[in-house]
Amino acid sequence: MRFVDEYRGEPEAQALFSALRRDTHHAWNLMEVCGGQTHTLMRSGIDRMLPEAIGLIHGPGCPVCVTPLEQIDRALAIARRPEVIFTSFGDMLRVPGSTTDLLAVKSAGGDVRMVYSPLDAVKLARENPDREVVFFAVGFETTAPPNAMAVWQAKRLGLPNFSILT
């Protein structure tokens, strides 16, 4: 299975929209939460093909989509510094800045590492006292508690080489 081409055929799409029109008996509001989802819905015309009873609400966007370009460029500049271990969740590694992304900085020799938790970055700071460890703390309310815990833990452990970029 290719998982792309088989969903792009017009007859198949029309059959799905016919089924939606037939089976939609009350109003629905759907929120897309990522700018990429919104872009795809609009570009493909799905928003215009939905039954009138189905409304789309444009949500807040995911952190990857709404992080300002200037913030990504700041992250790239920090990640290039030889004294820095720059850490981030994996989804931010491919997000382009003005000229490049974090994976390209890593390929060029920058010490960029993917972590699964801000506490992984704290652990790196503890293991590398001679390097500044920076965690790229993008996100919303759901990521604030673990970020705060990482700052608290670094302070509790006396790690002056840990910081976050928000």
Q: Can you describe what each PLM-predicted range is?
A:
Residues F135:
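Nuclease catalytic cores that cleave nucleic-acid phosphodiester bonds
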